[in-house]
């Protein structure tokens, strides 16, 4: 476990807020589970997210070890990051994150779990840590309209296929988006960002072959 009591959650979130400001990372959604956490974030530069997480770890791990008289690392390996196609998946990821406590049977209603951004998006508690994404603002013209629309989206839940897709992408670090999105991203970062295509490569169409000049 990485969070054992309320103070652990509060201290972690305070350091996360400090680090997000320092390294210019916009936090759109989060959940702190007993043994892991999820963040939906937009860093201002390519190193912002990793620097933020390193800074938080350098502060939180010593605090946790002192408090519970333990030594060693707290996390199992480096954090995993997934690039997403915002237009297609951002709001789905937001709901996936905030419904995590429900899927884990910690609560029945996400509103009953205090350590996530759901209360902010649902309009029951403003959270200064959260930077509302433009796609959240697009849910309505007023805060009231946005909150009602978001609560309805969460009430609808996610399909089993959506949960599986997001879970696999998170655990494996694959980009989350269409094949065109992944292809464009691979050209930018010069590495594979999704699972390898199965099967043999297709044979060239004979009608497209050219005679050597």
Question: In which residue ranges do the predicted regions lie?
Answer:
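Short Pro-Cys-Gly-centered "Cys-loop" motif that presents a nucleophilic cysteine in a tight turn
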Residues: 1-29, 33, 43-213
